[in-house]
Design a protein with these regions (language model features):
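Histidine-centered nuclease catalytic patch
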Residues: 40-104
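Long, low-complexity, intrinsically disordered segments enriched in glycines and aromatic residues
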Residues: 95-150, 158-165
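Short, small-residue-biased leader/transition segments that mark boundaries at the very start
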Residues: 2-5
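Hydrophobic N-terminal alpha-helices or hydrophobic patches in metabolic proteins across all domains
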Residues: 39-50, 164-165, 169, 206
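Short cysteine-rich clusters marking metal-coordination/redox-active sites
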Residues: 33-36, 81
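Short, flexible, mixed-charge glycine/proline-rich loop motifs
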Residues: 19-29, 70-73
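C-terminal, charged low-complexity interaction regions
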Residues: 141-240
Length: 240
């Protein structure tokens, strides 16, 4: 289509401009994929590919059928990972999967007209936690105790349509849960008081680093650390 070809032409003619768009999205999203929250990994070597691309939340093709030009709308642009589909990213043994059912984010979404049925990452309220996770599998589930009722259907659709329970993502989330468990167990073994240690852990895990980036799978850590996480986020005026 004309819309898709214009995007390709923009990238070819203006590589610096496209790079600047990516860098701004990277800053706006604190270094995380807008859908799965894996860290955005830029290429380390010449033969690597950035695990990062620009996604149009409302598909570019929608511009052809509606008055709004989604193609050029900054608020329609998201920075996302390759969803496990790109073998030439850094850390491919961790980030790439040859199996179709292990692909996530905008890979299964494609140009399907589902934008009205899933959560728009730019409009998710920062003040509430929408998801919880199974501690022994890393599986993502809508948290009915904290996710607003009006968002629960969209939240479920988001997990399903973007395949956010791909085995690859569950494995990564489980790795973070294990790290948090180990940190807590080590602290307790060293004589720490849980109520004093957990706020410190929440602060170290949930606040942005010196580059303004969040830890990957931020929402997993937020869920795992419970009220200690919410207290730290409130104190620091969290609004992702």
């Amino acid at each position: 289509s004309d819309v898709c070809s214009s995007d390709l032409h923009f990238r070819r003619r203006n590589r610096r401009g496209y790079r600047e768009v990516k860098q701004q999205l990277l800053r706006d999203q604190h270094g995380l994929c807008a859908y799965c929250e894996i860290s955005i990994k830029l290429a380390e070597f010449e033969d690597n590919v950035d695990d990062f691309r620009v996604e149009h939340f409302f598909p570019k093709v929608a511009t052809q059928f509606e008055k709004h030009n989604y193609h050029l709308d900054w608020h329609n642009l998201l920075g996302v990972c390759h969803g496990g589909s790109q073998p030439y990213v850094s850390d491919p043994e961790w980030r790439y999967s040859s199996r179709k059912n292990d692909r996530s984010c905008d890979v299964p979404k494609g140009g399907k007209p589902i934008s009205e049925r899933i959560l728009n990452p730019l409009k998710i309220p920062a003040s509430v936690r929408l998801f919880r996770y199974q501690e022994h599998t890393g599986k993502m589930i809508v948290d009915e105790s904290s996710c607003p009722k009006k968002l629960q259907a969209k939240a479920r659709n988001t997990i399903r349509e973007l395949n956010l329970n791909a085995p690859r993502l569950q494995r990564m989330r489980l790795a973070l849960i294990r790290i948090l468990e180990d940190e807590i167990n080590s602290a307790l073994a060293g004589g720490a008081v849980l109520e004093e240690f957990l706020p410190l852990l929440a602060e170290s895990i949930l606040l942005p680093d010196e580059d303004g980036n969040y830890q990957p799978f931020f929402s997993v850590a937020r869920w795992y650390l419970g009220e200690f996480a919410e207290d730290i986020l409130r104190e620091n005026n969290y609004a992702m």
